[in-house]
């Protein structure tokens, strides 16, 4: 089967049943304060702000997201943290404009598998981590014992072409070896898995539109950044993430 590999923020061609896209299907509601590092990357349109991707706080003033989420000037973005519900004000929300951002120098949106799909965002205002609603994730150089199940957190759609859920979603997924992941994607043009990727899979559960850039964690250890998956959000293919431990040294220089 041949398919066009795409990372999508908003829309897909209706006729392409096997295109590639990032976001969460088959998840459940997260509790308040359960994932305090989860953020929303938003873009301004007129006087309003709209969620386009996830992000993850790793210091009080820096966050990570997927490089493919960023194409405009830094001033067109803001980050929101402490947001459990997208359409409600819970009183725990904190927002900051973006001073600057840096995509990985070897990111290539035209290459198969979208290698090096990671970016650093610098916040204008540091986040207040005195409450349980907002706080940075722990990021270690290796994945420790995170070899089986991990939590994926998302603010994207719960089904392709459905509306975004109001509540932050989570899903428990199984980690695959990269060899197994590559085999499951065989036959899909452009679906290349490399050492800078980590894959998770659970039948009927998947990333979906709007989840790009969001975190994959084991406990409070950041392991992956949502990069790409199947656009139908069917849960029939693995979801592919940027393996953050592969980029530890680069991020520390930013």
From Swiss-Prot:
<dbReference type="InterPro" id="IPR018114">
    <property type="entry name" value="TRYPSIN_HIS"/>
</dbReference>
<dbReference type="InterPro" id="IPR050430">
    <property type="entry name" value="Peptidase_S1"/>
</dbReference>
<comment type="similarity">
    <text>Belongs to the peptidase S1 family.</text>
</comment>
<keyword id="KW-0732">Signal</keyword>
<keyword id="KW-0964">Secreted</keyword>
<dbReference type="GO" id="GO:0005576">
    <property type="term" value="C:extracellular region"/>
</dbReference>
<feature type="active site" description="Charge relay system">
    <location>
        <position position="117"/>
    </location>
</feature>
<dbReference type="GO" id="GO:0004252">
    <property type="term" value="F:serine-type endopeptidase activity"/>
</dbReference>
<feature type="signal peptide">
    <location>
        <begin position="1"/>
        <end position="18"/>
    </location>
</feature>
<keyword id="KW-0720">Serine protease</keyword>
<dbReference type="InterPro" id="IPR043504">
    <property type="entry name" value="Peptidase_S1_PA_chymotrypsin"/>
</dbReference>
<protein>
    <recommendedName>
        <fullName>Chymotrypsin-like serine proteinase</fullName>
        <ecNumber>3.4.21.-</ecNumber>
    </recommendedName>
</protein>
<dbReference type="Pfam" id="PF00089">
    <property type="entry name" value="Trypsin"/>
</dbReference>
<dbReference type="GO" id="GO:0006508">
    <property type="term" value="P:proteolysis"/>
</dbReference>
<keyword id="KW-1015">Disulfide bond</keyword>
<dbReference type="InterPro" id="IPR001254">
    <property type="entry name" value="Trypsin_dom"/>
</dbReference>
<feature type="active site" description="Charge relay system">
    <location>
        <position position="212"/>
    </location>
</feature>
<dbReference type="InterPro" id="IPR033116">
    <property type="entry name" value="TRYPSIN_SER"/>
</dbReference>
<feature type="disulfide bond">
    <location>
        <begin position="53"/>
        <end position="69"/>
    </location>
</feature>
<feature type="disulfide bond">
    <location>
        <begin position="146"/>
        <end position="218"/>
    </location>
</feature>
<keyword id="KW-0865">Zymogen</keyword>
<feature type="domain" description="Peptidase S1">
    <location>
        <begin position="24"/>
        <end position="254"/>
    </location>
</feature>
<comment type="function">
    <text>Specificity similar to chymotrypsin.</text>
</comment>
<dbReference type="InterPro" id="IPR001314">
    <property type="entry name" value="Peptidase_S1A"/>
</dbReference>
<comment type="subunit">
    <text>Monomer.</text>
</comment>
<feature type="active site" description="Charge relay system">
    <location>
        <position position="68"/>
    </location>
</feature>
<feature type="disulfide bond">
    <location>
        <begin position="181"/>
        <end position="199"/>
    </location>
</feature>
<keyword id="KW-0645">Protease</keyword>
<feature type="propeptide" description="Activation peptide">
    <location>
        <begin position="19"/>
        <end position="23"/>
    </location>
</feature>
<feature type="disulfide bond">
    <location>
        <begin position="208"/>
        <end position="233"/>
    </location>
</feature>
<dbReference type="InterPro" id="IPR009003">
    <property type="entry name" value="Peptidase_S1_PA"/>
</dbReference>
<keyword id="KW-0378">Hydrolase</keyword>
């Amino acid at each position: 089967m041949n398919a066009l590999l795409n990372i999508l923020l908003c829309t897909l061609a209706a006729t392409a049943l096997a295109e590639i896209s990032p976001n969460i299907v088959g998840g459940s509601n997260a509790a308040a304060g359960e994932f305090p590092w989860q953020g929303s990357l938003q873009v301004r349109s007129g006087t309003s702000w709209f969620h386009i991707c996830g992000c993850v706080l790793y210091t009080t003033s820096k966050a990570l997201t997927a490089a493919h989420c960023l194409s405009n000037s830094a001033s067109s973005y803001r980050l929101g943290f402490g947001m459990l519900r997208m359409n409600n004000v819970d009183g725990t929300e904190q927002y900051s404009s973006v001073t600057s951002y840096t995509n990985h120098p070897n990111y290539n949106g035209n290459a198969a598998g979208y290698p090096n799909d990671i970016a650093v965002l610098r916040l204008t205002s540091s986040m207040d981590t005195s409450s349980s609603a907002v706080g940075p994730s722990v990021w270690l150089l290796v994945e420790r014992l995170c070899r089986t199940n991990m939590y994926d957190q998302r603010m994207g759609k719960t089904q392709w072409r459905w509306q975004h859920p109001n509540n932050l979603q989570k899903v428990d997924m199984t980690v695959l070896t990269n060899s197994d992941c590559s085999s499951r994607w065989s036959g899909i043009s452009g679906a290349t898995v490399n050492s800078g990727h980590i894959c998770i899979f659970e039948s009927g559960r998947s990333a979906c539109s709007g989840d790009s850039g969001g975190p994959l964690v084991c406990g409070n250890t950041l392991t992956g950044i949502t990069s790409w998956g199947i656009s139908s959000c069917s849960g029939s293919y693995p979801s592919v993430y940027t393996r953050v431990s592969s980029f530890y040294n680069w991020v520390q220089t930013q």
